[in-house]
């Protein structure tokens, strides 16, 4: 199973900038975006652990330049049950 990288921002523009930076910085796939409320937005990427770490680092830096970065986290091996509850499944070709 691949790692899961997440970035949460306050504001959609910062999240879009962070998402763009993440997919450009490493071989990751953007698998979800969620607007939570109160201006909070989260983007999720999947890839190997190193790629998710590089992507979230780049995304965090980009978000901080544009708006407010709230949180960044990488789960190296998310449990399979998470995919049944949260929209984090990697669906697509294997050469991301």
UniProtKB/Swiss-Prot annotation:
Keywords in alphabetical order: Bacterial microcompartment, Virulence
Effect of gene knockout: Essential, it cannot be deleted when the 17-gene operon is otherwise intact, possibly due to polar effects on downstream genes. Not required for cobalamin-dependent degradation of ethanolamine (EA) when polar effects are removed. A double eutD-eutM deletion is also not required for growth in the above conditions. A double eutM-eutN strain grows as well as wild-type on EA and cyanocobalamin, but a quadruple eutL-eutK eutM-eutN strain does not grow.
Hey, which pathway is this one from? Answer: Amine and polyamine degradation; ethanolamine degradation
Q: What is the effect of changing residue 58 to S?
A: Still interacts with EutQ
- Determine if Ribosomal protein is one of this entry's keywords: no
PROSITE patterns in the record:
BMC_1, BMC_2
Q: Does the keyword Transcription regulation apply?
A: no
Please state, per the UniProt record, what induces or represses the expression of this protein. Part of the 17-gene eut operon transcribed from a single promoter, induced by ethanolamine and adenosylcobalamin (AdoCbl, vitamin B12).
Q: Changing residue 53 to D: what effect?
A: No longer interacts with EutQ
Q: Tell me where in or outside the cell this protein is found.
A: Bacterial microcompartment
Applied use: Artificial BMCs can be made in E.coli by expressing eutK, eutL, eutM, eutN, eutS (eutSMNLK) or eutS alone. Cargo proteins can be targeted to them and beta-galactosidase (lacZ) was active within the BMC, showing the BMC allows passage of substrate into the interior. This can lead to the development of tailored BMCs for specific metabolic reactions. The addition of eutQ to the eutSMNLK construct results in biogenesis of multiple BMCs. Can incorporate into the pdu BMC where it alters growth, suggesting fine-tuning metabolite flux by using different BMC components is possible. Can be used as a self-assembling protein scaffold for synthetic biology. Overexpressed, purified protein with a SpyCatcher tag added to the C-terminus yields self-assembling fibrils that are stable at pH 5-9 and up to 50 degrees Celsius. Addition of SpyTagged cargo proteins leads to isopeptide bond formation between the scaffold and cargo proteins, colocalizing and stabilizing the cargo proteins and reducing the time for the reaction to make maximimal product.
Residues covered by the BMC domain: 3-87
Q: What is the effect of changing residue 24 to A?
A: No longer complements pduA in the pdu operon
Q: Name one GO cellular component term.
A: ethanolamine degradation polyhedral organelle
- Which Pfam families has this protein been placed in? BMC
Provide one Gene Ontology biological process annotation.
generation of precursor metabolites and energy
* Outcome when changing residue 54 to S: Still interacts with EutQ
Q: What does this protein do?
A: Probably a major component of the bacterial microcompartment (BMC) shell dedicated to ethanolamine degradation. Each homohexamer has a central pore with an opening of up to 8.6 Angstroms. A positively-charged funnel leads to the pore from each side of the hexamer. The pore probably allows metabolite passage into and out of the BMC. Expression of eutK, eutL, eutM, eutN, eutS (eutSMNLK) in E.coli leads to formation of a single BMC. Expression alone leads to thick filaments that interfere with cell separation.
**Which NCBIfam families does this UniProt record tie to the protein?**
PRK15474.1
- Further facts: The need for a bacterial microcompartment in EA metabolism can be bypassed by increasing the levels of EAL and an acetaldehyde dehydrogenase (not necessarily EutE).
Quaternary structure, per UniProt, is: Homohexamer with a central pore of up to 8.6 Angstroms diameter. The hexamers pack into a two-dimensional array. Interacts with EutQ; a probably cytoplasm-facing helix (Val-49 to Gln-64) interacts with N-terminus of EutQ.
The family note in this entry says: Belongs to the bacterial microcompartments protein family.
What PANTHER family has UniProt attached to this entry?
Answer: BACTERIAL MICROCOMPARTMENT SHELL PROTEIN EUTM, PROPANEDIOL UTILIZATION PROTEIN PDUA
Query: What protein is this chain from?
Result: Bacterial microcompartment shell protein EutM
Its source organism is Salmonella typhimurium (strain LT2 / SGSC1412 / ATCC 700720)
* Gene behind this protein: eutM
């Amino acid at each position: 199973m691949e790692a899961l990288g997440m970035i949460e921002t306050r504001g959609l523009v910062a999240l879009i900038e962070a998402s763009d930076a993440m997919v450009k910085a490493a071989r990751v796939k953007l698998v979800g975006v969620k607007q939570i409320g109160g201006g909070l937005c989260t983007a999720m990427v999947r890839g190997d652990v190193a790629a998710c770490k590089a992507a979230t680092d780049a995304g965090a830096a980009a978000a901080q330049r544009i708006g407010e970065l709230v949180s960044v986290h990488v789960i190296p091996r998310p449990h399979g049950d998470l995919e049944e509850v949260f929209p984090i499944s990697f669906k697509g070709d294997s050469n991301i």
